[in-house]
């Protein structure tokens, strides 16, 4: 060991081993190769940084091959440069393959950026969800029905990608479904995995629509196996159902001029055609609800008394116009639950139809 170290020291002290230095510089290919290698080693991290790195290194080593073949005339220079260039090209090919493997169709990529990326869902987890629906995008033509009440079985869960879907029951409009909303989330949550049922509403496409659909059994298996995906779907479905409930609540406000509690049972019977079919009976019930809120008139002399505004009109063909009344205070939720839904419930039973939800529920 000491002999080798002393020999290296002698070589360093003696100076360069080159007998004669070349007077002319190397050709342009040699300098180009070194410039490309310098740029390549300045590459950053990440996928695009790797593309930058291996791209410049491949070009630099190929220039070294040309320089070793035409100028240096060294077989070892050619072989080593060629080997390094091949390794860099293989790395580039591997990166391209990985990118193509991770690429999703346009619809699913937009769905990921809109729905899952804000929740920081990993891309690999999203791919498992997409694989469950077989990466198929289904379509609906205008006025084509997705489900018919009382006929279509509940055997899938669908998410609308584009278009608009109308939800109705007995021909009465309930609400719309817009892109990136579930089309049948209430039906999905209403059944256990071992139960079967049919739709209680009709879903009709108002425009050309596209959607994705998960088979019920396949999705249940995925949710059972992956707890993270199960929690994700639970959050998405809960938010979707709450949005539909608030939509119905807003429609009630627009129709009756007061806001209903969304926890009231059988909101459909207030929205549905049964409330309109009640006619005078429903108006009479409304008056009965509102009358207790009006303060009784004060006692006045007989000569100064006027005809009360709510007196019974005479039985003539020309009915007087109803008197205008000030907007009353909002009635209690128990009164609303006992008046309007019960009238609709009796009419639905007389028609032989089952209500959407039980109308007799304990007071909260």
UniProtKB/Swiss-Prot annotation:
Transmembrane regions listed in the UniProt entry: 37-57, 77-97
Chief localisation class: membrane
Keywords noted in UniProt: Cell membrane, Glycoprotein, Membrane, Phosphoprotein, Transmembrane, Transmembrane helix
UniProt xrefs under Pfam families: POPDC1-3
Residue numbers of Phosphothreonine PTMs: 361
Mode of membrane association: Multi-pass membrane protein
Amino acid composition bias (Polar residues), ranges on this chain: 300-309
Tissue distribution of the protein: Expressed predominantly in the heart and in the skeletal muscle.
InterPro entries: cNMP-bd_dom_sf, POPDC1-3, POPDC1-3_dom
Residues covered by region (Disordered): 276-333
Location of the protein in the cell: Membrane; Cell membrane, Sarcolemma
Any one of the GO CC terms: sarcolemma
Annotated glycan sites: 4
GO BP term, example: striated muscle cell differentiation
GO terms assigned for molecular function: cAMP binding
Assigned protein family: Belongs to the popeye family.
Its job: Important for the maintenance of cardiac function. Plays a regulatory function in heart rate dynamics mediated, at least in part, through cAMP-binding and, probably, by increasing cell surface expression of the potassium channel KCNK2 and enhancing current density.
Protein's name in the database: Popeye domain-containing protein 2
């Amino acid at each position: 060991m000491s002999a080798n170290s002393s020999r290296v020291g002698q070589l360093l002290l003696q100076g360069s081993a080159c007998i004669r230095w070349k007077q002319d510089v190397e050709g342009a290919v040699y300098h180009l190769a070194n410039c490309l290698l310098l740029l390549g080693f300045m590459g950053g991290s990440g996928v695009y940084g790797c593309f930058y790195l291996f791209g410049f290194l491949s070009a630099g080593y190929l220039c070294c091959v040309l320089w070793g073949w035409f100028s240096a005339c060294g077989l070892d220079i050619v072989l080593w440069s060629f080997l390094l260039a091949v390794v860099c090209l293989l790395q580039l090919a591997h990166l391209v393959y990985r990118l193509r493997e991770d690429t999703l169709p346009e619809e699913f990529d937009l769905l990921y950026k809109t729905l899952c990326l804000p929740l920081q869902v990993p891309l690999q987890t999203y791919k498992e969800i997409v694989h469950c629906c077989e990466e198929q995008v289904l379509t609906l033509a205008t006025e084509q029905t997705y489900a018919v009440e009382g006929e279509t079985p509940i055997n899938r869960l669908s998410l609308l990608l584009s278009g608009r879907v109308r939800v109705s029951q007995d021909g009465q409009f309930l609400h719309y479904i817009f892109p990136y909303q579930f089309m049948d989330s209430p039906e999905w949550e209403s059944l256990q995995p071992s139960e079967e049922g049919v739709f209680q509403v009709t879903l009709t496409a108002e425009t050309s629509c596209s959607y994705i659909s998960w088979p019920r059994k396949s999705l249940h298996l995925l949710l059972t196996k992956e707890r993270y995906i199960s929690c994700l779907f639970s959050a998405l479905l809960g938010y979707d159902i709450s949005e539909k409930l608030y939509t119905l609540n807003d429609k009630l406000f627009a129709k009756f001029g007061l806001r209903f509690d969304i926890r009231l049972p059988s909101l459909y019977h207030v929205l549905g055609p049964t409330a309109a079919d009640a006619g005078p009976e429903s108006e009479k019930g409304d008056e009965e609800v509102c009358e207790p809120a009006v303060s009784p008139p004060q006692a006045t002399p007989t000569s100064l008394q006027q005809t009360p505004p709510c007196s019974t009109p005479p039985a003539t063909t020309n009915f007087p116009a109803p008197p205008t009344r000030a907007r009353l205070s909002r009635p209690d939720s128990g009164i609303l639950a006992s008046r309007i839904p019960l009238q609709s419930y009796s009419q639905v039973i007389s028609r032989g139809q089952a209500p959407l939800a039980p109308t007799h529920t304990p007071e909260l």
